[in-house]
Amino acid sequence: NDAINGIMTSMVEDKTNIAFGIIPNGIGNDFAKYWGLDEDNYKAAVDWIINRRLRKIDVGRCNYFDGEKHTSRYFLNAIYIGLGARIVQISDGTRRFWGIRELSFVASMFLLLFERKLYRTHLCINGEHIRGRIMTVCVGSARGYGLTPSAVPYNGWLDVSVIYRPELIQLFSGMWMLLQGRILNHKMVKPYRTRKVKVLRAQNASVSLDGRILDRHFPLEITIQPEAITLIIPN
């Protein structure tokens, strides 16, 4: 994410002339998986970078106030508001305790499984104002760790999934549907497709951007910049 933001904020006039590649690492790297990159086969990723097959892809942009100034942060995968960002927060904390990424991720999921905390939220999507107590919102240029499974990182659109609080039995069915890539069929999930999202309010909700916790003050304005950067993709 730092590399993407470095490119997007550089003084280079045509940023698509800069190509970047991915050597996947970590847990749940579904942006890499979308392109067929295997976390366990870094040698193949290096070979693909050397072969240099290029594809222009979209870049998401989040405008916000960081407490001192208005600023922007760019992303390739997704922004989470609420539960998804809490998982990032807790997994970072438990990683310091456990020392193992996989164990910290599973521990954070378990700790939050029964929390199902709701946040008073006000969104504006395609001119529609959405108000209510919402568990999590995912705004994805790509698949967003499974919550925006229909998103395509080069179609010029943002996919949005607004998730309301499920009953406990619905939570388990939702987890199964998430793993199967069918989360949009869950009755507590409302999907949208748009080019701009305004998050006017999400009371006490954490926000993560491509796995980073964002120090922010609402409102947020999330937009998409079509084919703004060049990715080296597998053959």
Task: State what each model feature region is.
Residues 1, 24, 211:
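Aspartyl protease active-site motif detector
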Residues 3-5, 145-146, 216:
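Short, well-ordered alpha-helical microsegments
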Residues 5-138:
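Catalytic core of DAGKc-family lipid kinases
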Residues 83-88, 142-147, 167-170, 206, ...:
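Short, acidic Gly/Pro/Ser/Thr-rich loop/turn segments
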Residues 95-103, 150-170:
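Gly/Ser/Thr-rich active-site loops/lids in small-molecule metabolic enzymes
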Residues 119, 148-149:
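Anionic-ligand binding region
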Residues 124-126, 131, 155, 162-235:
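ATP/nucleoside-binding phosphotransfer catalytic cores, i.e., glycine-rich phosphate-binding loops
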Residues 136-145, 151, 181-182:
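Phosphate-binding core of ATP-grasp and ATP-grasp-like enzymes
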